[in-house]
Each structure stands twice: as structure tokens, then as C-alpha cells.
């Protein structure tokens, strides 16, 4: 009888320990989720910045990667990617390098078409159109004979100019993940077509689907802050073997001597 009581007591203590441990883990996970959201909120607070020249007076996170006296360079990038059953994958977008030292901005409007040959091999063709920015206006630096294309470039707006995440904390049922080995982190939300940012994208792009997108915020590097890592956002409307429709955007603050587009990992779905 005494042995039975001791056994029951031990079992109760084990169950209680497991319960307390689980609560502790849940609290730790919630704390990490909160840290990830706060990290994303820092960059999302830049949206919207209607006048791109305001970035000349904005300073981002600085670390030992910056040389003394370097004011840094902002890299902003937006592009739309569309592939349907009846068309090849095509991306159209722009990247700008906003140098705070020289207060000058240059970049490229890039059109990429990806085709597949009869053997199933993919081939990409990039066409770049160099641009500069003056008085918040995008100006091609080389003649463009195609009037429609020239107007598309001159009228181009980056997502950071019109996107708005003031309601980001109201987004429900987010899927937050963290990989300490990389380190990398992300937050995914299912949006509705009534979402402000979704409406803005549909207003500016001919998006050939009525499906509401998922918003993916992703980053890598130290959660406490780093100029080496990157943060990107993606609105994915459709993603399967035959069709891909998504929009990507990023705003990064980097040392001025390190403005290579590829080296900064702007997106794993980059040009």
C-alpha cells in the first residue's frame, strides 16, 4: 500500500515537471516570436517613404562592418514575377543604390525572361536599363526607343513608397519560425484581397489571378542586428510547377563599399 502511494506520488511529480517544462518552453518560444516580430517591425517602419531622397537623411543599423565616416548606402529593390500556363516566367523590377556619402543614386531597371528548351533546360535572358534618381524622379541614363518601356521606367514606384504595415501587429495566425544554425527567421501570414497592400499591388500590376496572397517576411543574420544579413518580403499569389505569381521587395542598409547586389543576398528569388 505504501509502495503504491509512493508510486502515485512519483508519477504526479513527473507529470508536474513535464507540465512546468512545457510551460517554460512555450514562454521561451513566445519570447523568440516577439523578438522576431520586433526585428521585422524595425525595417517595416520605413514603409511608406514616399520621397526616396529622404533616405539620404535616414541611418540604419551600424556595426563594425562600417568604416569610420561612412554614412552607408541604402539598397532598395522591387520586382514582380509572373509565369502562367501560357507564358514564360518574366520578372520586371528595379534596384537603386542610394549613397548617403555622395547623395547620389543610381541603379537598373531589369527585365528577365526565363525559357525552357526541348530538353527541359532553363535559360534566362536579362536586359538592364541603367537609371539615376534626381528630385525623387527615376531617369534613364541611356536613350530608350520604346516609349511604353521608357514611361514604365520613369513612372516606376518602389513598394517602400506606397506599402504600409501599420496594421502588421493585427495580422492573425502567423507562422513564425527560427533556425539558430544559420541563423534565419521568418513570419508568414495569409492575407485577404481586402488588405491595403494587396489592393495597392493589384492597382499597379496586372496580376492574372484572384487568389489572395500569402505574405512572407524573412531574414537572416543576428536577430540583435547586423549589416551582413538581409531582410526580404514576398507576396506569393500562386506557386506551383506550372504557374508562379509573386512580388518581392527589400530595403537594406549596407556599408558603401559593399553595394554588390548579389553579395547582399537581397532575395533567394533574385535576378
Swiss-Prot record:
Origin superkingdom: Bacteria
Key word Metal-binding present: no
Major localisation: membrane
Any single GO CC term annotated in Swiss-Prot or TrEMBL for this entry: plasma membrane
Topology relative to the membrane: Lipid-anchor
Lipid moiety-binding residues (N-palmitoyl cysteine): 23
Lipidated residue numbers (S-diacylglycerol cysteine): 23
Family stated for the protein in its record: Belongs to the staphylococcal tandem lipoprotein family.
Protein name stated in the entry: Uncharacterized lipoprotein SAS2373
